[in-house]
Amino acid sequence: VMNGKDKISVIIPCYNVQKYIMRCFDSIYSQTYGFENLEVILIDDLSTDNTWSVLESLQRQYPENVISLKTQK
């Protein structure tokens, strides 16, 4: 519990979403609930574009709130 609110986990499966994932993330980030009360779990399903690089970058930028995972073949 943070600031009297329950923490919410947002799970986003990803496959070749390099073009769209930032728009999705920005939408989550701007929610009135407060980003500090969110845990965003991004799961890359072996994308063939640069999705994984974007997810890693988000995790580095927001280490307290973002977890990036990559499925294994």
Please tell me what each predicted stretch does.
Residues 1-30:
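N-proximal low-complexity "stem/linker" segments adjacent to membrane-targeting elements
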Residues 5-8, 29-42, 50, 63-67:
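Short loop->beta transition adjacent to catalytic acidic/histidine clusters or analogous donor-positioning motifs
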Residues 22, 49-58:
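Acidic helix N-cap motif at the loop->helix transition within catalytic regions
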Residues 24-26, 37, 44, 56:
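Generic preference for flexible, low-structure residues
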Residues 44-53, 73:
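A conserved acidic beta->alpha catalytic loop
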Residues 70:
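Short loop/edge segments at beta-strand edges and connector loops
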